[in-house]
From Swiss-Prot:
This is Coiled-coil domain-containing protein 149. One of its GO terms (cellular component) is membrane. It comes from the Eukaryota. Belongs to the CCDC149 family. Residues 1-199, 259-286 form a coiled coil. The keyword Coiled coil applies.
């Protein structure tokens, strides 16, 4: 190899000397011009030849790249065709991307597994806490039944007692409102009696009209045709009519208050019925409730029977 390079160097050196020296028959100036012209032509020819070679090489490179791509596709198709689940042929950079994606997926899977384990542990803690609360409720029911000297087979439910307590509180509030209404009516009747005692020298009908407390019969008598036609347009009659209108307005207001209290009572009773139905459904689902004629072990409170009796009596009175 070294001998070949040495021979190549000697030949190039000799050729370079010949080009520099040129034709010995020409004068030195002409010889230099001829040498330069020859060098220029040779350089142009060489450049042209090299340009053609570059084009040819570029064309061959494109063909080789196309053949390489086609060959890779053919190999991949053959691999996929030979196996049922073939392994795809990936390039180096694609394999790196896939490895990175696989690592990220593994990290996500590990994170999800950790979260799942934490959720399972939390669920187990909640179940244990629920069991402890259930045991506590059972113990409270037994203690409450023992305090109330109840029967062992009829344990009083705490939820039923709480529901009974809410119902009684609402009823107590309703009764307070009714007591206040009755007190206002009593005060009005007292004022009417005082005015009646003080109004002397007037007839019975006019005094009744001025009291502000009228019965249905008194109103019908005052508004009858005989009294209406024979009623003179005097200040006394106008005052009686004003008193009658005031009494009617007060009576209407009282009736409205009674209706409102009745609606509130109906709402309380409706809520009570809904709570009892919910309690019965809960007992039915838990297996503690049975068909009529059979007994169940959990009591819903002694106040419930009183409430049912009261509800039946109220429905009979309404209808």
């Amino acid at each position: 190899m070294a001998n070949q390079l040495r021979e190549r160097h000697q030949s190039l050196k000799k050729k370079y000397r010949e080009l520099i020296d040129g034709d010995p028959s020409l004068p030195p100036e002409k010889r230099k011009q001829a040498n330069l012209a020859q060098l220029l032509r040779d350089s142009q020819d060489r450049n042209k030849h090299l340009g053609e070679e570059i084009k040819e090489l570029q064309q061959r490179l494109g063909e080789v790249q196309g053949d390489n791509k086609l060959l890779r596709m053919t190999i991949a198709k053959q691999r996929l065709g030979d196996e049922e689940i073939g392994v795809r042929h990936f390039a180096a950079h694609e394999r790196e991307d896939l490895v990175q994606q696989l690592e990220r997926a593994k990290e996500q899977i590990e994170s999800l597994e950790h979260d799942l384990q934490a959720s399972v542990d939390e669920l187990q803690d909640v179940k244990e806490e629920r069991s402890s609360y259930q045991d506590k409720v059972e113990r409270l029911n037994q203690e409450l039944n023992h305090i109330l000297s109840g029967h062992e087979n009829r344990i009083i439910d705490v939820d039923a007692l709480c529901m009974e307590n809410r119902y009684l509180q609402e009823r107590l509030k309703q009764l307070h409102e009714e007591v206040n209404l009755l007190k206002s009516n009593i005060a009005k009747y007292k004022n009417a009696l005082e005015r009646r005692k003080n109004s002397k020298g007037q007839n019975k009908s006019s005094s009744s009209a001025l009291t502000g407390v009228l019965s249905a019969k008194q109103v019908q008598d005052l508004l009858s045709e005989d009294h209406g036609c024979s009623l003179p347009a005097t200040p006394q009659s106008i005052s009686d009519l004003k008193s009658l209108a005031t009494a009617l307005l007060e009576t209407i207001h009282e009736k409205n208050m009674v209706i409102q209290h009745q609606r509130q009572t109906n709402k309380i009773l409706g809520n009570r019925v809904a709570e009892l139905e919910k309690k019965l459904r809960t007992l039915e689902v838990s297996g503690l409730w049975s068909l009529p004629g059979l007994s169940y072990n959990v009591s819903i409170g002694f106040g419930s029977m009183f409430f049912l009796k009261y509800l039946c009596l109220w429905l009979i009175a309404v209808h």
